[in-house]
Each structure stands twice: as C-alpha cells, then as structure tokens.
Amino acid sequence: MWLEILNNVRSRKKAIKFPKTFQKSPDEVIETVTPVKKMNKVFGKSLRIRQVDAGSCNACEWECNMLTNPIYDVQRFGVDFVPSPRHADVILATGPVSRQMELALKKTYIAMPEPKLVISCGDCALDGGIYKGSYATRDGVSNVLPVNCHIPGCPPPPKTIVKEL
C-alpha cells in the first residue's frame, strides 16, 4: 500500500485506486429504498440506533460496524449509532439473548423514548440460531421484546442491513 501511495505522489494522482476485487463502486452497492412519509414525520429523516450485543458470537457486530466504513457510510442516509438508549429511536439487537443480558436488554428498551422500534439482526436473534434450546439463552429477541423487523443471515451482510434500515 505504501508503494502505491508513493507512486501516486510521484505521478501526482489524487487518490488511491478502488480495489479491483469490487465489481461496483460504493454508491452502486447500496440501493436506497424510498422512505415512507409517515416514518419521515416520526423520525425526521434520521435514525438513531442503539446496538445491543445480547450474547452473540460477534459476527453480526462486525457486520454492523462495517456500516460506518467508507464503503457503506450509513451516515449519509441520516443513520447514526448512539451510545445511550435515551437518544435512540431503534434497538438493533444481536444474539440469542443470554440469561445475563435479558435484564440489560429490557432496561435498554425501557430507557428509550417513544416511539420505540426493535430490530433483531441475525439468525440467533430470530430464534436462537445454533444456541437454540440452550439453558443459557432465551431463544431470540422476540421472546424478550416486541420485534418490529428482522434482518436474516448468519451473519447478515452489510448491504442487507442497510436495506432493512
């Protein structure tokens, strides 16, 4: 990479070439869906997300973290991840909900202002995934909170997460 930067400086190129492994540019990767007018009135064309890891293997968190990189850049759509549930519109919950995280997830939901949305991300959050039936889990977010939307996949790719948001 350093050699490529040095060559760009010598040839006075303005930017590093986009990787050849990608078939499309970042703007073509994300197909935006026209938002519903009612949702625009409620959320003001922006969405604040509180991500909660409820006992997952962290694969879904990695994919959610990729949403903020330059390729997907969800902030250009008005989507922000917030550290406090008091500023959040949506809980993005991942994992099968371990017994230790059940109370924390409920407290996060209670701390959110109205209107509240819950999105379960990944197959573990839907029905427990590979942890289904374990004594240590609640077999999905829907057994703890009312879920409004589910993002399928193990883990779901960032493009799918962006489409659902």
Segments predicted by a language model, with ranges:
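Metallocofactor- and cofactor-centric catalytic cores in central/energy metabolism, strongly enriched
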Residues: 81, 93, 98-102
